[in-house]
């Protein structure tokens, strides 16, 4: 063979050997090219459910009791192809659920169990998810039976609850409402390392300085959920491991008490698997041969399953009675001294010394055998790290407090990424309102006449188009589709910490809110009421309408009332602090230099807002000419008529009479090619709409002479989409 697939004379003229989508891709040739595909993932073309499918309605028809009964029966229905430890699949399913939800991180709200993403790469093949493919395969007959009434995302979470309940634990509750995705998530940054479990001193490490973990990451190594259980980089340093435990769980929204409860509660059940050489384990699912049918980590050690199973390489159970909820974990943790040794797979583990017979652990498959309790390095940090020890001692002495803390922390773990209670479905939703759910009081409705009257007052108040538009944008654009947090509902822009964020220009914000509060008070004195959340959005709509009218377009921006106003008591300021933007390309704001380019951060923000590339294009172009820039900056305000909704930004950006050159860090100056006279200044997030071929194509379309009305209409549609992004009551 010469490698040439061109047909020889007399042969079939059809080319063979190269399928669609293969070969070198654009990102291989130009690795710094921004990735706009993240704005168009999970489209209708990859979703088999159809546009009319409503998962919330389908879930309401689910017989939850029957489903839970089937799941309970599955727990002890051991299968020969993957037998259950101790005759009970509960611990396996708890790990499955934990690892589905545990990828969540607060910095960008991405990860977590709300999409069923554990079915897809890379998560389905992470080293830390070893053999969870077997857990999902065990669930398939039940998913097949209940079909569209239960998503994989909900099933992966519910199964963990049922597993706990089947072993004697009372859970805090369960909420459905997680629709499935049907393709891998391409927007999530999992790290830059080029190998699984790369140590912290490797190239492209996520660590810098004295072990400072890169944001937004919340795991210590590529392919792990949280920490390396053997210790940092596999080094069995107990106190250092405790630091990792605190940091990674903290980045997943857990405080130290919740962290201790989760570790101890989860390790009350089951065992770890490392009863053989790691070299016997086959490739992960995505790398497995086609005949493996999606299963990975197939082992040649003995039977490859049951007593011979190898998963993490750690071997052993934490306590006696691994399928029963009790206080055994804390009992053995504090009762015994621990000696460092190696598992059969070569992993660092700690075994209790001088163990009394009552604390020996029964073998998972042979009742004639018993083993000493095992702890990982991370487990022992609960006893030896000074910040974790007080919580561990308190729980060890108070079983009721431990059970309550674990129940609440487990519920938080499995529901933190669902957003507000308005998205919760089912009869097991807890009645108690929790601060981390970002509660918002019910709003009031105003009719069209009231809205018109209020807009007239706003327009007569002295507020500029820039004031109205920028304040509404600041309020609504906090929304994150990743974990459904933020948004205009609640009007938390009035409260700490948002009112003090630099990006929101606190002095200007206070002035605008003061004017709107006066209008609100006057309206309410008439026996009616309007929330500040609604009024802020309504003011933005009024500003857009006025700007469009100034450009010759008579429009009405759709507005739906019903937002409520959250109080300071309903707002966890610390949890909102992580949402403060250090970069917002829509407002041409950058607080500091980042390792990621400004244009990439613009795309990142657009993806969190659920925007497409065309929507991002019209919003940036419109917000520039409406004066939404941070601090009134002139960068990117490519118009001679600011305050008028027009496509001037795009028209002038594409003008070949302008030559752009760098004029400072991140700033560019546009000069007349012929005269050299200064015309404009702009940033990278402005110029990208002329430099990137895909964005330029969109810019050219909206800059056409016949596209002005289309631009205005599309800007309004994208604006309304952002204003209503958190209105789960409307869907």
Curated annotation (Swiss-Prot):
CDD domains per the UniProt record, alphabetical: catalase_peroxidase_1, catalase_peroxidase_2
Gene3D superfamilies: 1.10.520.10, Peroxidase, domain 2
Annotated keywords: Heme, Hydrogen peroxide, Iron, Metal-binding, Oxidoreductase, Peroxidase, Plasmid
Entry EC number(s): 1.11.1.21
Site entry (Transition state stabilizer), positions: 95
Source organism superkingdom: Bacteria
PROSITE patterns, sorted: PEROXIDASE_1 (PS00435), PEROXIDASE_2 (PS00436), PEROXIDASE_4 (PS50873)
Location of cross-link Tryptophyl-tyrosyl-methioninium (Tyr-Met) (with W-98): 226-252
Listed InterPro entries: Catalase_peroxidase, Haem_peroxidase, Haem_peroxidase_sf, Peroxidases_AS, Peroxidases_heam-ligand_BS
Binding site for heme b: 267
This protein's GO CC annotations: cytosol
Role summary: Bifunctional enzyme with both catalase and broad-spectrum peroxidase activity.
Name of this chain's protein: Catalase-peroxidase
Source organism (scientific name): Ruegeria pomeroyi (strain ATCC 700808 / DSM 15171 / DSS-3) (Silicibacter pomeroyi)
């Amino acid at each position: 063979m010469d490698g040439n697939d061109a047909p020889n004379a007399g042969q079939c003229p059809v080319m063979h050997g190269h399928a669609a989508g293969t070969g070198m891709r654009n990102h291989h040739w130009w690795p710094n090219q921004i990735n706009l595909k993240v704005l168009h993932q999970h489209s209708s073309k990859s979703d088999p459910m159809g546009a009319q499918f409503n998962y919330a309605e389908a879930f309401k028809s689910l017989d939850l009791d029957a489903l839970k009964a089937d799941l309970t029966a599955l727990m002890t229905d051991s299968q020969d192809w993957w037998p259950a430890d101790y005759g009970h699949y509960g611990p396996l399913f708890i790990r499955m659920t934990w690892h589905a939800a545990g990828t969540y991180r607060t910095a960008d709200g991405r990860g977590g169990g709300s999409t069923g993403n554990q079915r897809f790469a890379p998560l389905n093949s992470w080293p830390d998810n070893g053999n969870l493919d077997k857990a999902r395969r065990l669930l398939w007959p039940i998913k097949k039976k209940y079909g569209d009434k239960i998503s994989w995302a909900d099933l992966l979470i519910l199964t963990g609850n049922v597993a706990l309940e089947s072993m004697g634990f009372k859970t805090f509750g369960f909420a459905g409402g997680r629709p499935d995705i049907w393709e891998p998530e391409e927007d999530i940054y999992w790290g830059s390392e080029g190998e699984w479990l790369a140590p912290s001193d490797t190239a492209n490490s996520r660590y810098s300085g004295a072990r400072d973990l890169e944001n937004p990451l919340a795991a210590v190594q590529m392919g792990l959920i949280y920490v390396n259980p053997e210790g940092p980089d596999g080094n069995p340093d107990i106190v250092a491991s405790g630091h990792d435990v605190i940091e990674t769980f903290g980045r997943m929204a857990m405080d130290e008490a919740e962290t201790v409860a989760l570790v101890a509660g989860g390790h009350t059940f089951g065992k770890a698997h490392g009863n053989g050489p790691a070299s016997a384990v086959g490739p992960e699912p995505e790398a497995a041969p086609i005949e493996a049918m999606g299963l990975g980590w197939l082992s040649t050690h003995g039977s490859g399953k049951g007593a011979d199973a190898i998963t993490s390489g750690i071997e052993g159970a934490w306590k006696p009675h691994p399928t029963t909820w009790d206080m055994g974990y804390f009992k053995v943790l504090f009762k015994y001294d621990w000696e460092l040794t190696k598992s059969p797979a070569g992993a660092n583990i700690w075994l209790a010394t001088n163990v009394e017979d009552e604390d020996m652990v029964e073998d998972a498959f042979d009742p004639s055998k018993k083993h000493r309790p095992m702890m990982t390095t991370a487990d022992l940090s609960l006893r030896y790290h000074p910040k974790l020890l007080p919580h561990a001692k308190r729980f060890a002495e108070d079983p009721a407090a431990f059970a309550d803390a674990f129940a609440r922390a487990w519920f938080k773990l499995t529901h933190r990424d669902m957003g507000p209670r308005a998205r919760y479905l089912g009869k097991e939703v807890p009645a108690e309102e929790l601060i981390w759910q970002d509660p918002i009081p019910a709003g009031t409705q105003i009719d069209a006449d009231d809205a018109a009257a209020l807009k007239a007052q706003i327009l007569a108040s002295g507020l500029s188009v820039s004031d109205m538009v920028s304040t509404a944008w600041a309020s609504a654009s906090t929304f994150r589709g990743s974990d459904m947090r933020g948004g205009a509902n609640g009007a938390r822009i009035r409260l700490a910490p948002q009112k003090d964020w630099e990006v929101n220009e606190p002095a200007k914000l206070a002035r605008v809110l003061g004017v709107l509060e006066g209008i609100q008070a006057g309206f309410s004195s008439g026996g009616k009421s309007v929330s500040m959340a609604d009024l802020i959005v309504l003011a933005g709509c009024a500003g857009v309408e006025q700007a469009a009218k100034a450009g010759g377009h008579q429009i009405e921006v759709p507005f739906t009332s019903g937002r409520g106003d959250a109080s300071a008591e309903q707002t966890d300021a610390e949890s909102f602090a992580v949402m403060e933007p250090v970069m917002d390309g829509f407002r041409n704001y950058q607080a500091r230099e980042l390792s990621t380019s400004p244009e990439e951060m613009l795309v990142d923000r657009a993806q969190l807002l659920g925007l497409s590339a065309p929507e991002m294009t019209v919003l940036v172009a419109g917000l520039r000419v409406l004066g939404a820039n941070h601090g009134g900056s002139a960068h990117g305000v490519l118009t001679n008529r600011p305050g008028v909704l027009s496509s001037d930004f795009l028209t002038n950006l594409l003008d070949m009479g302008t030559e752009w050159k760098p004029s400072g860090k991140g700033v560019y100056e546009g000069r007349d090619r012929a005269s050299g006279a200064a015309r404009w200044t702009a940033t990278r997030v402005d110029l990208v709409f002329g430099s990137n071929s895909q964005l330029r194509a969109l810019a050219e379309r909206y800059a056409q002479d016949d596209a002005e009305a289309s631009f205005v209409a599309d800007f309004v549609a994208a604006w309304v989409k952002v204003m209503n992004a958190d209105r789960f009551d409307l869907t």
